[in-house]
Amino acid sequence: MLQMPKLNEIPPGRGGPGEPWGEGRWAGPTGPEAARPARGARGQARGARARWDSWEHSRLPTHPGPGWDQCSPSFLCAPSSQKLIMESKDEVSDSDSGIILQSGPDSPVSPMKELTNAVRKQQRALEARLEACLEELRRLCLREAELTGTLPAEYPLKPGEKAPKVRRRIGAAYKLDEWALHREDPLSSLERQLALQLQITEAARRLCAEENLSRQARRQRKHAALQEEKKLRDLQRCLGDRRRNSEPPPTTVPSLGRELSASDDSSLSDGLLLEEEDSQAPKPPPESPAPPSRPLPPQSLEGLQPTGPESGGQERAPIQNSPWKETSLDHPYEKPRKSSELSSESSSPATTPQDQPNPSSLWVLDAASYHVVPIRNVPGQRQGRTSAPATPEMQGRRGQSQSLRVDSFRAGAEGRGRSAFPRRRPTHYTVTVPDSCFTPGKPPLPHPACHSCSEDSGSDVSSISHPTSPGSSSPDISFLRPLCLPEPPRHRGAWGPACGRELAPHYSKLLLPAGYFPTGRYVMVAEGHLPPGEWELCRAAVGAAYDEEGAPLRYQRLVPSHSRIVRTPSLKDSPAGRGLSKAAVSEELKWWHERARLRSSRPHSLDRQGAFRVRSLPPGRESFGRASGPRTQVPPVYVLRRSTDGAPVQVFVPENGEIISQV
């Protein structure tokens, strides 16, 4: 057995660094009396040791020995309330008990002390890092408080510390969206929950379908799958109810909005039929749209396949119903066109300036006998620009309703927007004009213009339609009654822009040449029975229509008109065309040959305001058309006063609002 030394004995090898190993180490008296002189002798031999009074207190020597400079104190003095941390490898002793301890590699307490020191060092590092993070958080919270004026709740407070008062910085005042910060859209929340529930339900089904399961596990998984499917159905039902409740009630405004978003290729008769259906029955919700009585025409040349009724409303038209912008004038004429451009090329955004009201308003004339004025489109129109033929209206809808579709009149720059109503591509039409337009006693009233929007409608003023006869796919035109306005100074005639294809009777049996109607953008406004040589070209702004009381004419029921536009491929197809005189036919042929002789190339686009190419003007009228090149534009002027010989003395330019007088 190992013999442990007694308390007051010095173990072997502990005699000090100056004592050699020998036989007499264990000999001699033992006890505190013998150990104390030995320790004193070792202290005197070293001379560099501090003199110890007790275990916890030490004093530096009053007279350091010669080896004091090379030695350093090996003990740390701590307060009496803390333990002494021993960091020296040398031996220490307790003067009271006589215990001699050594902190060396062979000591059993050394690994524990080292671990304690390492843990305490790591703790101090973590505390420093935490303090740095808290300081950064305080700084960020103070910056946020300077912007919002409110100290965030995340501001870290020390024990006993009060929250600082922060005032909002000048120039940082703004209002946060409380709804976006503290609330969320219930529909989006339900949609997210539904998407998550779909995944959970699918996972539960896969777990239930696994093989090699015990009967109890299979039963539990099947029950869980049924519960998830029930939650999924509840979410779907709740989402459907919320969507139905959030939609606005069906009114007449949504029906008009659907017509406004229709494509430019849709025909006017189709749009009017949809309007009548919407006025008779409320609009169903978008989730389950009711199919109309007949399908809509194709929205583009590419999609000639059957489409649903929502294709016109869901998909935007090739040309949106946006206000006209000046940047559209920068596009070149010979630009290669895509299919969407081909399908909406003839709808021009800037052909009907409505900047100010004008006496040349719309008219309604009583119907009587008629003269046939065949009007043709420009021969240079592309074949690919024609849309699908309009579907004839049903027989049962004849005479049910006559609607006047009038958008709100816009003034200023907003008056240049695109027409929000459907447009029809140019085709061959014959216009029947009542004889009441031409009273036998005096020339017609100023600017009696037939109003029709059956073709390219570039205006937001109005679109008038009446039920057509069987076999006719074109809507009727109506004539508005003339107003009791003072007659302006009479002039010989003027060309003016129309709301879509406006066709005016020139005189009783005159056939207009096709070159004077470039895709229905201009109209001859005649004031007397004048030969074509006396015609003049100018632009007259068409103002808002007014009724007899002077109020703007917006929505009213018109009396059934007996005049209409019918589709006629040639003159012989029209019954009234057979009675035309040979002189009228010869006049038309003469003008046709004149155009063919002087024609060099056809205009490619009429998207510019006033882009009307003047091929030939009568003698003496060349000043109105600036025929300076292949793209001559007619200046938009309105003749206010003339001299006795017929020369214009005072003209009005609607484009910039100037009145030009000749001195």
Curated annotation (Swiss-Prot):
One of its GO terms (cellular component) is cytoplasm. GO terms for biological process: adherens junction maintenance; innate immune response; intestinal epithelial structure maintenance; nucleotide-binding oligomerization domain containing 2 signaling pathway; pattern recognition receptor signaling pathway; positive regulation of canonical NF-kappaB signal transduction; positive regulation of cytokine production involved in immune response; positive regulation of interleukin-1 beta production. A motif (Nuclear localization signal (NLS) 1) lies at residues 164-170. Residues 1-73, 219-363, 375-405, 448-483 are annotated as: Disordered. Residues 23-47, 259-272, 455-475 have a biased composition (Low complexity). Disruption phenotype: After infection with Citrobacter rodentium, mutants show significantly increased bacterial loads at day 5 compared to wild-types. They are able to control the infection by day 12 post-infection, they exhibit significantly shortened colon length. They don't have impaired cytokine response. Mutants also exhibit impaired recovery from dextran sodium sulfate-induces colitis, they show increased body weight loss and reduced colon length. Residues 117-147 form a coiled coil. Keywords: Coiled coil, Cytoplasm, Immunity, Innate immunity, Nucleus. Residues 349-361 have a biased composition (Polar residues). It is found in: Nucleus; Cytoplasm. A motif (Nuclear localization signal (NLS) 2) lies at residues 332-338. Interacts with IRAK1, NOD2 and RIPK2; the interaction takes place upon PRR stimulation. Interacts with YWHAQ/14-3-3T; the interaction increases upon PRR stimulation and is required for cellular signaling pathway activation and cytokine secretion. Interacts (via N-terminal domain) with CYTH1 and CYTH2 (via their N-terminal domains). Interacts with FBXW11 and BTRC; associates with SCF E3 ubiquitin-protein ligase complexes. Expressed in peripheral macrophages and intestinal myeloid-derived cells, is required for optimal PRR (pattern recognition receptor)-induced signaling, cytokine secretion, and bacterial clearance. Upon stimulation of a broad range of PRRs (pattern recognition receptor) such as NOD2 or TLR2, TLR3, TLR4, TLR5, TLR7 and TLR9, associates with YWHAQ/14-3-3T, which in turn leads to the recruitment and activation of MAP kinases and NF-kappa-B signaling complexes that amplifies PRR-induced downstream signals and cytokine secretion. This is Innate immunity activator protein. It comes from Mus musculus. The lineage of its organism: Eukaryota, Metazoa, Chordata, Craniata, Vertebrata.
